[in-house]
């Protein structure tokens, strides 16, 4: 903190000769040290003044006797002093000059807003100096020039500006002139010298001893030396460093220059000397402090006293009171640490025993400036605030746990009734405002300005509270009152944008936006939205100024885009991150092989500066010694707290892998989130407990830990798993599903609280509650469902299932609230149906999509010719808002300039990442058609999938390689690329095609078939399991290819390896039957067969094995589940068939085995186009007979002739529709929400770094893509709750970067809190999506399904023969 000094010396100061001020003046960053033999000997060290008012002296007196002075000081508690007061106090008789403290001090002073100091304090403290009037004439005589105006030096002749000269005290001018030449010769600037002139003694010390300082502190910068020297007694602190720096650099502390400067700057000369004198005692037993802890304690006002108190009280507080050494250090590491520790010793038992606070909360209160006073105030006011005002102890602790906690508590006691009754705030809002540094002033300012800001400026009370609920809230509110009209009228910002800036960057950011917005927009090409994004963070002012300075350099010299510069700057610490990127980008790219995009990804987080520096230091170690890839290192670093996560991975990776059996990929997955450090440490501690005592698997523990807040989620699972399972009937897998998201802790606690209410009072099932909770923001979604479910159902006509569908996404809360608000408008004014509104809302970012539909639907329909159904189709995806806006912008260009049809544009836009796909089509369509020979339709086909952007870019890059080097045709490349995960599939084909063909004997067509259906994961699994399945299990390569050539091929192959012996040896199936089931119904069908054969369900008990196999091949698990649950209209159909069909032919049962053989033949055929003709020969069937067989199993003649069989679930839907047991499936854009269970694995992390591919996900991380021959394992009636929570980690998470929440089959999306800009799927997203059984993959067969004719009576009879003869179908035929 900058010291407060009167520019007019008091009589006491004038007495001091020559250099005495350096030794005598009280220092603001340490206790004052009077000269030996002075009249203050023996008195407590004087600290800076407090905001606590002191009584006025009885009468003004020009001087006190020594005795009366001592008496006065005894009444004055040094611990009450608060340096924040002094920062804002103007000097007596002179204009106030703003100080320029160091960054940390500036932040502290900015956050500690203090009351204006009472005059009586100044009188008492100033007058209370020892009487030294007699020596004054000697000083005046010795320095007559000081008082003579004629003697003042005109420093402008030395290059000082008028403003700089005004900052230099008149009496210091001659000293500045005397040392100017020497200081400039040492490299100090005029600004440096002006800052040093605050403490004139430092001018001479630095001028004379600079070379010695650099020798002792070789890394010290000019700013470091000025930062120490400008403090009171700064010259003595610099001289102390010269004396002891060498020894402090050595054992036991081994401090670096930065630490030494920090101690000298903040703790002063006494702290430097105390650290030197006590270094062995502090680091040795029993204290055993680390060097960092010693620096933390010493680097504060009163650091010397705090060190001495730690030596004395640390053993007592730890042994007698149960604190940890880290907690003691935390308390001591603030101004007033000594007093806080002593008060902690005295009040900890009282606050814990009498008031029920846990020790952690007491430590939190004490660990701030003014901790002593805060503890005493909590003891006094806790009962009053809780009993009389209804606050909870946690709220009282939250208010007290900040600088100025005492004053904030007292102000809450005084103003809570007023703010609630007169201004309509809630107690929670009052607590939120008070729970920051400067809470007192913020509360008082809210009381004063709330009416003005709401009535005159149109803000809401919530917005006023948001602005006030930060450090510096008072100043921010006052600045909003002053600048809101200017920023809105003159600069075009909205009130919401002004509120966003004020609620984060505060006063300084608002003023800087006013000043720099025109410059950044006009001269640098930024948009107002980008300027607002940069400003809306702590340090927004500095970030804006740095963008103005470095944007041209970073773009022109380093090749970054303005958007990347904005991304780096739009975080807390943006200034430092930008400067570090400028410094380290060349090093990280040239020496370490990172790409600029990866460097930007690392820098674009809180703590980006530190993360970049740590990557530079640890990348070689983590890659060479620990076997990580650069991509993995980047993934870990590209989160808030990346520095700490990297250091923890370096430390714990060997332990977690060797002692706990984790893989490096799992360690990386845990570390690659905000809070990765804490999550890794918690996994090390709790993994054995959760696995042994609670029965979780290692994979489940990793799933929980691999999210933001993983530490808290693990601890909550340990605590609540028994309760939720025993008392509430959840399964461990459901508990894991809830916990495996950002905010898992809060979601689990809310489920515990609301599950009984939602089930009993609102009629939800536990599965539905779990589905809602199993997303980011699950807590808020559950609470909103409790509040809005009755309203949405009764007033708006939605069903319970629709409300659950909307809520079961990240941002569910906001989506529900928006549906409540916009449903009437969209239906009445825009003609949408409630089902369409639900479809739009039932995705991540549903709120934004609904609002955009309301805004753009008329424009898109009237001006661009879209139908409402097409608008709904585009909006009904993650990123729907951005896709709609991009369609509005690019539709004319794509149609007029590039010749696309409106339907093609809609097809491209109607996927996750539609915005980016459209933009990429605009950019690459000419290149791909002209340079690579693709047709326009082929480009559209590639783009019309999730990840279309990345697939198009990969086709541009790899098409020549795959065709020229590997012999693929362009059509084959397009076929592989035209699926979700196309990018990764193409890259895997390039890598594995030679291996699979040369080493495993597959043909090129077979590799293409696997890649075009099962994708990257299926190709890798075939490489791994083909020898095992052929040699150990007797399958042929064609059969392995048939199983792999489906969505989920990886999981199907692994399940065949696991279950083939069981099904053949224990249950009597043949290998061919197992292959038929696996190649039609996949993993889920195989597991359903095993479950039925092991534990027969009554509904299927009457079926023979051949019947079961046929049913599984016919419709997979959905068919078996549907039969178990009872098929609608089946009894009526059976009666009708019984009446109309006479004697049944005896060959029908044989037909089922034949169906299985035919389906297996087609699935295993290496050339599907020839399968139909060869099947006629193979099975001795006529063309018509084979077509009829396929009709019975839901395949059209066109599909059969082409060998392209639809997924089993699609065939089953056709069968049910053709038989009349199920209504035609409504259009997803007009009737109901697309099945949520069908996308349960994909879009969990699309909200991160959405508009640019994230370098952290460029590794091998894709899943089996959802493909043209894909399957869905959903039940035919929609997503069953049971399916929504099946944990599938072992099959799906085979790559390190898959978002852990994808292991749970659940509704899609993860836009927590309603992201403003979800959009681009990055490589990992596309990779993981490939493990999903997405029903939309059946889109190529949709038209055929709609036209599939109804069964005739013979075909109905055949179907009824396949179904059970009794039970769920209710009769026989």
UniProtKB/Swiss-Prot annotation:
GO MF annotations in UniProt: DNA binding
The Cryptic repeat repeat ranges on this chain: 256-273
Top-level lineage group: Bacteria
Region (Disordered): 1-68, 127-152, 1250-1286
UniProt entry tagged with the keyword Protein biosynthesis: no
Deletion consequences: Reduced virulence in susceptible rice; its introduction into a deletion mutant restores virulence to the bacteria in rice plants. No longer induces SWEET11 (Os8N3, XA13, AC Q6YZF3).
Database matches in InterPro entries: TAL_effector_rpt, TALE
Subcellular location: Secreted; Host nucleus
Per-repeat ranges for Core repeat 23.: 1069-1087
Each Cryptic repeat - repeat, start to end: 221-239
Pfam families named in the record: TAL_effector
Motif Nuclear localization signal NLS3: chain residues: 1305-1308
Core repeat repeat locations: 289-322, 323-356, 357-390, 391-424, 425-458, 459-492, 493-525, 526-559, 560-593, 594-627, 628-661, 662-695, 696-729, 730-763, 764-797, 798-831, 832-865, 866-899, 900-933, 934-967, 968-1001, 1002-1034, 1035-1068
Chain positions of motif Nuclear localization signal NLS2: 1268-1271
Biotechnology: By combining the central DNA-binding domain with the catalytic domain of the restriction endonuclease FokI, TALE-nuclease (TALEN) enzymes able to target specific dsDNA sequences can be created that enable eukaryotic genome modification. Other potential uses as transcriptional repressors, for transposon targeting, DNA methylation or histone tail modifictions are also possible.
BP terms from Gene Ontology: symbiont-mediated perturbation of host programmed cell death
Compositional bias annotation for Basic residues: 131-141
Keyword field: DNA-binding, Host nucleus, Hypersensitive response elicitation, Repeat, Secreted, Transcription, Transcription regulation, Virulence
Region (Acidic activation domain): 1136-1364
Main location: secreted
GO (cellular component) term, any one: extracellular region
Entry domain remark: The central DNA-binding region is composed of 23.5 tandem core repeats with 1 base-specifying residue (BSR residue 13, also called the repeat variable diresidue, RVD, residues 12 and 13) each of which recognizes 1 base in the target DNA. The BSR is the only residue which contacts DNA in a sequence-specific manner.
Assigned protein family: Belongs to the transcription activator-like effector (TALE) family.
Name of this chain's protein: TAL effector protein PthXo1
Organism placement in taxonomy: Bacteria, Pseudomonadati, Pseudomonadota, Gammaproteobacteria, Lysobacterales
